Amino acid sequence: MDERYDPKKIEGKWQAHWDAAGLFKVKEDPSKEKYFLMEMFPYPSGKIHMGHVRNYSIGDVVARFKRMQGFNVLHPMGWDAFGMPAENAAIKNNTHPAKWTYENIAAMGAQLKAMGFSYDWDREIATCKPDYYRWEQWLFVQMFKKGMVYRKEASVNWCHTCQTVLANEQVEQNMCWRCGDEVEQKKLKQWFFRITDYADDLLEHCDKLPGWPEKVVTMQKNWIGKSHGAEILFSVKDSDVKIKVFTTRPDTLCGATFMCLAPEHPLVEDLSKGTAQEAVVQEFVARMAKQDKAKRTADDKEKEGVPIGAQCINPLTGKTMEIYTANFALMEYGTGAVMSVPTHDQRDFEFATKYGLEKIVVIQPEGEALSPETMTEAYTDPGVLVNSGQFDGMKNTDAMEAIAQYLDENDMGKKTVQYRIRDWGISRQRYWGAPIPMIHCPDCGITPVPEDQLPVILPEDANLLEGGKSPLPELDSFVKTTCPQCGNENARRETDTMDTFVESSWYPERYCSPKCDDGMFDVDAVKYWMPVDQYIGGVEHAVMHLLYSRYFTRVLNDFGLVDFKEPFTRLLTQGMVCKETLKCPEHGWLFPHEVEGSGDERTCTKCGKIVEAGRVEKMSKSKLNVVDPEELLAKYGADTIRLFCLFAAPPERDLDWSEEGVEGSYRFLQRVWRMFAAHMDEVKDAQPFEGSPDDLDGYLKDLYKKTHQTIKKVTEDIDGRFHFNTAISAVMELVNMVYGLDDNLQGEKRAGVLRAAVEAVILLISPMTPHFTEELWSLFGKTQCVLETPWPAWREDALTADEVVVVLQVNGKLRSKLNVPLDTDDEKIKEMALADEKVQKFMGGKPIRKVIVVKNKLVNVVV
């Protein structure tokens, strides 16, 4: 064998071997236990980045480990290929999104294969292919027929210059990311999925996801946002109009002194029309339409509003309340109307203080009298009702129910439940997406495309190079069609395309039978493989993608296509890959290769000025703190990159990039290679020792025990815990112990014990460094791949130590340690402890009150 490990010589060879042998291809096998592992599929941007490498390295370790444990492992890969990034890149590069996307898929696929990831490429999917989105359209039609889809007018981000709708992500400081012009709110007809019909079920099952991170479950619950409260009707003064308000605090109703409507609330325009406030209200509403809603309603944002020129009546007190439109009220929460109780809600308190509005205390803490004049903040804790008429003296928690019941009995309101979640608007006025399969007929109205005419194929002869709006409405060859119901030849196709979250909501099921051409998927295949046993991806998808996937699975369940409700049994959200930023005072952000020197003396290669090192943060193209996986691959090989990504940090934490760490991983592989080479001749023809540790003594016994202890440690660290860093550390310790074997220590069992240790090292790191270990395994003369070799098992009788470390304390404080034989007699160990020099020093000659011995753990001398 070569003296040094050279990844260039071996990685391509083993990738070709795996491919030729079809080792990653799987099919349903009822005789084997299945394991379905997925990482979130990527958008085909053109090149993989280190975030991809880390994500897929984590998944590949688990996939290879489970295969070696005997599971039938499905580990697929595909492409989230529709969406605005491809469309925008195509416009920028004067090409077509389809060409751009498929070229990127080919390039990134080659990069992933070069990393040695064990994907079943026969199951590759791309969501932009008609054979994929055909079935998405089919399901849309079924949902439409069942009333699960509807169309209504809704507010969207609109860029007048580009004549297009923008997703929230495309709005930066309320400016269009493309042209820089202001974005406004515009009402357009949009298609919606009735996800709110499933809100309770989605929420209830959040507590039935034990394999999910608690923070993700909490985020899902908060997004669904179930609130118990009351719906209260406020009559508008001198009008028949009633304003419906949802509140979780009906106990504070008597303290409501004004009302706030969201700027988007339809009554703002209606009630201000013809009043002296009309122009002021219009200006305020227009200004609010240009503000980001999340920032507008943030706790630290100054509260502001204007009266709309109308008043309403408090149904309990009969008092007149001024109606305002305010920046902190949102149409998306409750009813878009807020009964404002300044003494018991902090936002209302700040608003009332700013505009000099009345404050009435209606909840007092027991034994204390609050006064509006002296309050510096709202009182939001429990207490007793005051200034609340017949409800005075009640605990506020009891008054919630009593007031809600009173409102119900007097037709002023009712108890109800509200949700933060809203129906899912899936319309996108963009080109590069799955066409919505609906037809608009002048006579019949809206009708679905017949199933035998699916898919509605996205035309590729559209011109995207002029402006930014979708070309579909102007493309007669696409738009003009015949009504399938009445034959009217003036019918038009729907020109909106679907939100790309729709494609990613059912792709796990499609992986089970990606070539199925008579349905969304083969039902029996899905029954075998689903649900996904382990899903891996970024926490940035903790809400939308995962929630939509859970919703879609319930829809499929309702149609009888699947027999489960939750698509993902276990979820791992890996941390980001981070690196320090480097900035030149003259040239701005710099790539790492544009900096020379070290420490505080680093300089810009362009101008020689001292470079400012910023904080360590997520790798991003905008700040140039990126590392190109291809450059690393050429320098170190795939296995070193994989090993570093797995060793540098636990998977759920952020990984701080370190070139020294990569070098360290490379040195470790060289060290293992040298270890193998040094003992190759001795162990090549030996059989691994498999006997009892009692048949060994001295260092050989210790090495044999260490081998089995390491097998147990690595197995448990990988299986479920995903503690890859500590698993690798354990293997490093075993390697060190092999290096510590004295050449002069001979014996008939030496070669067998050494062979067992070396084999364990190879097998245990094989999921992390597959090419490297396949090469070493083959040098042993093995004809079967490592991946086809059973995962090693440990011997229970080899796990116990012959010696233990016993902690010595004086008055409960650690003072020394002893290495003693396991299960040493209590009297003997007490004698050894009292004779220890450090223990005697800290006893200071004081009389001993007692000596506590915990066998094999500690001795505490109390003086």
Swiss-Prot record:
Binding site for ATP: K621
Superkingdom: Bacteria
Listed GO CC annotations: cytosol
Location(s), subcellular: Cytoplasm
Catalytic activity from the UniProt record: tRNA(Leu) + L-leucine + ATP = L-leucyl-tRNA(Leu) + AMP + diphosphate
MF terms in GO: aminoacyl-tRNA deacylase activity; ATP binding; leucine-tRNA ligase activity
GO BP of this protein: leucyl-tRNA aminoacylation
Predominant place of localization: cytoplasm
Coiled-coil residue spans: none
Chain positions of motif 'HIGH' region: 42-52
EC number: 6.1.1.4
Pfam family, any one: tRNA-synt_1
Signal peptide: none
Motif ('KMSKS' region): 618-622
Enzyme kind, highest EC tier: ligase
Alphabetical UniProt keywords: Aminoacyl-tRNA synthetase, ATP-binding, Cytoplasm, Ligase, Nucleotide-binding, Protein biosynthesis
Similarity field: Belongs to the class-I aminoacyl-tRNA synthetase family.
PANTHER family membership: LEUCINE--TRNA LIGASE, MITOCHONDRIAL, LEUCYL-TRNA SYNTHETASE
Protein name, per record: Leucine--tRNA ligase
Origin species: Desulfatibacillum aliphaticivorans
